[in-house]
A protein has these predicted regions:
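Intrinsically disordered, low-complexity regulatory segments
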Residues: 1-144, 148, 317
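Long, highly charged, low-complexity internal segments
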Residues: 2-6, 13-17, 25-59, 70, ...
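Short glycine-centered, acidic/aromatic-flanked micro-motifs in structured strand/loop junctions
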Residues: 84, 254, 284
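Alpha-helix capping and helix-loop boundary segments enriched in small/acidic/polar residues
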Residues: 84, 111, 133, 243-244, ...
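A generic secondary-structure signal for well-formed alpha-helical elements
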Residues: 100-105, 128, 153, 157, ...
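Extended, highly charged linker/hinge segments and catalytic-adjacent loops that couple domains
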Residues: 133, 137-138, 149, 270, ...
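Amphipathic alpha-helical segments of the small helical/lid subdomains adjacent to P-loop NTPase cores
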Residues: 139-169
């Protein structure tokens, strides 16, 4: 963009002012912001259901938020570009600041999944109307509200009932329940022997169904001993095994845990670092597909890997990018 002149909290140049958010600059306020009596955890006050959401600014984010508000109101600024992460949370981070600043200037959206210079330039050449992502913003607000309602009310309820702080969350609690159920299943599991009759005919082995009674399996074995077997029919099928899809964050986290023993957070930290170094696409996604504008880049990258990396030897043909976009 040519914004190379460094200022206090932003960059300037070539008609652009470029600044940044440091995570969420606005957060949903705690219950006591709605009523002072909510400062104490009491059963009688539940459920707490705000009619309109209030937001508060973390102390360490006040300076940057004030700067962004000032820049949006700058008379030199005639439009605003949202360039946060291409996802629900990125949309929420920007929109809350935009609304908090009372900004009504035209807003456009930079939607890219790569930090490469070419991808960024391409994205700025094809900015989209901010209104295209209104539903995404609505979804983010709903997610944040649901987390607040369940987390605040359920945590206070169970903490008051049991006399100890018990944290409850929309995602955390069901996940914990799955772990508890799995652990319970493992502890209560009782192994039982089973038997599978098999017939070996040269290089071919035919297997029967599992049996829990040894006597049944023994009877089949005795009936087959010293007798001949006949192949009555042969059915041949040609099957195509599709290659796996691209990774989304959850799939990648599972794979890295299985192979390397990484925690989910470790995997996210590593792939986030790769993303910032322009070596991976946007990681915080549940999609296993690339956007259409990445087709050419993806194809050229695969061809380069095929021609220059040891594992590419023997690969032939052209990559079918349509499968992953």
């Amino acid at each position: 963009l040519g914004a190379t002149e460094r200022k206090d909290g932003y960059l300037e140049g070539s008609g652009y002012l470029v600044s940044w958010c440091v995570g969420h600059l606005l957060e949903l306020a705690q219950p006591e912001a709605y009523k002072e009596q909510y400062a104490k955890w009491r059963y009688e006050d539940l459920p707490i259901l705000p009619e309109n959401w209030k937001y508060e600014v973390p102390k360490d984010k006040k300076t940057q938020l004030a700067l962004l508000c000032r820049l949006m109101k700058d008379k030199r600024v005639d439009s605003v570009v949202c360039a946060t992460d291409a996802g629900r949370e990125g949309e929420l981070i920007f929109r809350l600041v935009y609304e908090y600043a009372g900004c009504n200037k035209p807003m456009e959206r930079l939607w890219i999944s790569s930090m490469e210079d070419a991808a960024i330039r391409e994205g700025f050449d094809h900015l989209r109307p901010g209104s295209d992502y209104d539903k995404l913003y609505d979804a983010a607000v709903c997610r944040a509200g649901a987390d607040w309602l369940i987390g605040i009310n359920a945590t206070r309820l169970f903490s008051v009932l049991y006399g100890v702080t018990l944290n409850v969350g929309r995602v955390m609690s069901p996940t914990l329940a799955l772990l508890v159920q799995r652990e319970s299943d493992i502890e209560s599991f009782i192994s039982k022997p089973f038997y599978v009759p098999e017939i070996t005919c040269g290089g071919f082995t035919a297997s029967g169904e599992k049996m829990t009674e040894r006597s049944e399996a023994e009877k089949i074995r005795m009936d087959c001993d010293h007798n001949s077997a006949f192949v009555r029919s042969v059915e041949k099928q040609v099957k195509t095994i599709q290659p796996p899809r691209l990774y989304d964050l959850t799939t990648l986290q599972r794979e890295c845990n299985r192979i390397y023993g990484y925690t989910a957070q470790q995997t996210l930290d590593y792939v986030q670092s790769l993303y910032e170094k322009k070596l991976a696409t946007y990681p915080r996604t549940d999609s296993q597909y690339l956007t259409k504008d990445m087709q050419a880049t993806a194809a050229s990258l695969i061809l380069w890997l095929r021609d220059n990396m040891p594992f590419g030897k023997g690969c032939a043909g052209e990559p079918d990018i349509d499968r992953v976009t």
